[in-house]
From Swiss-Prot:
One GO BP: translation
UniProt source species: Haloarcula marismortui (strain ATCC 43049 / DSM 3752 / JCM 8966 / VKM B-1809) (Halobacterium marismortui)
Name this polypeptide is given: Large ribosomal subunit protein uL4
InterPro entries named in the record: Ribosomal_uL4 (IPR002136), Ribosomal_uL4_dom_sf (IPR023574), Ribosomal_uL4_euk/arc_CS (IPR013000), Ribosomal_uL4_euk/arch (IPR045240), Ribosomall_uL4-arc (IPR019970)
Gene Ontology terms: cellular component: ribonucleoprotein complex; ribosome
Molecular-function GO terms, alphabetical: rRNA binding; structural constituent of ribosome
Function of the protein: One of the primary rRNA binding proteins, this protein initially binds near the 5'-end of the 23S rRNA. It is important during the early stages of 50S assembly.
Keywords for this protein: Ribonucleoprotein, Ribosomal protein, RNA-binding, rRNA-binding
Encoding gene, per UniProt annotation: rpl4
Alphabetical list of PROSITE patterns matching this protein: RIBOSOMAL_L1E
Residue ranges of the region described as Disordered: 37-103
Listed Gene3D superfamilies: 3.40.1370.10
Length: 246
């Protein structure tokens, strides 16, 4: 399987054989498992205050009064789980292990599988990306890594007929629910992933929904956000050679 190399003007600059890693069968189950493990393992531990619902002088009157043995204060039940302002019966605990295990071979295969999915135009389209070309992934010359201005990247994406995906991701939506008040107000789709050789692209990192990564560090979550394989991806020629070793 071959891919066309494009220069910074969007013109054809040769062809390159895609590495064998792009022939890996797409394992959506492993990709989802790897993404869930990555998300779970970076979560912060959380739990209730040890004394929540117990800071009260309420006491039970005991037997002989013809009423339930429930601790009361000012005539209202306290402390017990079934009472308003009582403690939680089984609250979340910080000592609980919420991490997920993933075998090294599973992690490696998930990355290779996610890379292969970027070369499947049907999967990329099904994921919701907007582009007007038949060939994916997009491969550009190494001169791309020298770009410093975002507008230069925008011009290249327009020439390659993939800039519509940036416009799609620029349409943010306000989330429903309590998360919108906790620093997670907007929902923004993931757009193009830029994979370079030496350093992550500074010119492309501020585009709406875009992510940047190096070929040696790109992971399953970069290639398949949310566990959905088939992200629209731009590789430099050198980065394409490096991912062959993943």
């Amino acid at each position: 399987m071959q891919a066309t190399i494009y220069d910074l003007d969007g013109n054809t600059d040769g062809e390159v054989d895609l590495p064998d890693v792009f022939e890996t069968p797409v394992r959506s189950d492993l990709i989802g498992k790897a993404v869930r493990a990555a998300q779970a393992n970076r979560k912060q531990d959380y739990g209730s205050d040890e004394y929540a619902g117990l800071r009260t002088p309420a006491e039970s009157f005991g037997s002989g009064r013809g009423q339930a043995h429930v601790p009361k204060q000012d005539g209202r039940a306290r402390r017990v789980p079934q009472a308003v302002k009582g403690r939680s019966a089984h609250p979340p605990k910080t000592e609980k292990d919420r991490s997920l295990d993933l075998n090294d071979k599973e992690r490696q295969l998930a990355v290779r599988s996610a890379l292969a999915a970027t070369a499947d135009a049907d999967l990329v389209a099904d994921r919701g990306h907007e582009f007007d070309r038949d060939e994916v992934p997009v491969v550009v010359s190494d001169d791309f890594e020298d770009l410093v201005k975002t507008q230069e990247v925008v011009s290249l994406l327009e020439a390659l007929d993939v800039h519509a995906d940036i416009d799609r991701a620029d349409e943010t939506k306000i989330k429903a629910g309590q998360g919108s008040a906790r620093g997670r107000k907007y929902r923004r789709p993931a757009s193009i992933l830029f994979v370079t050789s030496d350093e992550p692209s500074t010119a492309a990192r501020n585009l709406a929904g875009a992510d940047v990564a190096t070929a040696s560090e790109v992971n399953t979550e970069d290639l398949a956000p949310g566990g959905a394989p088939g992200r629209l991806t731009v590789f430099t020629e050198s980065a394409l050679a490096e991912v062959a070793e993943r």
